[in-house]
Amino acid sequence: MSYQEIKSIVALVSTLLINGLYGWYVFWRYQQEAPGVAELFRFWAVAMLIFMGVALVAQILITVVFRAAYRRITGETEPSFADELDRTIGLRATRNAYYAFALGLVVALLTQVLSLPPVALFATMFLAGIASEVAQALTQLYYYRRGV
């Protein structure tokens, strides 16, 4: 397996793990606090802002650990350049991530058109973010395996 394939798998697993654990924690807290209508938007705003920080720090730590482990296990350093193939795959993965997030955003807005509770809006937006990261990692893995 190439460095890029392993990196895509690590990104996919870490995304699912970080988002899954944080999502479980937030929904557990939501049930414990049972915020009323007045506090609902504040609850979700705080939860999402904290998540951005937690996810950023976790991704940085995972990247550092991955690079160190890769270097230690294989004895190779990660490629210091990106060729045309890497750029093309990166662009396609980013495009698919945007599509996944845009679709999730439309579904989130539809929850309000259908008069679902506001928690459905926030949960759908949270899931759209996860779907976009997963789409990006899967697209990269697919194209590194199959080729462009």
Give the location of each predicted region.
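Membrane-water interface of transmembrane alpha-helices
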Residues: 58-76
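Alpha-helical transmembrane segments
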Residues: 42-62, 127-129
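Membrane-interface helix termini and inter-helical loops of multi-pass transporters
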Residues: 28-41
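Short membrane-interface loop/juxtamembrane segments of multi-pass integral membrane proteins
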Residues: 77-97
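Hydrophobic residues within the alpha-helical transmembrane core of Major Facilitator Superfamily
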Residues: 20, 61, 103-110, 138
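Alpha-helical transmembrane segments and their immediate juxtamembrane interface regions
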Residues: 121-148
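Alpha-helical transmembrane segments and their membrane-interface junctions
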Residues: 98-118
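Cytosolic-side membrane-entry/anchor segment at the start of a transmembrane helix
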Residues: 1-31, 138-148
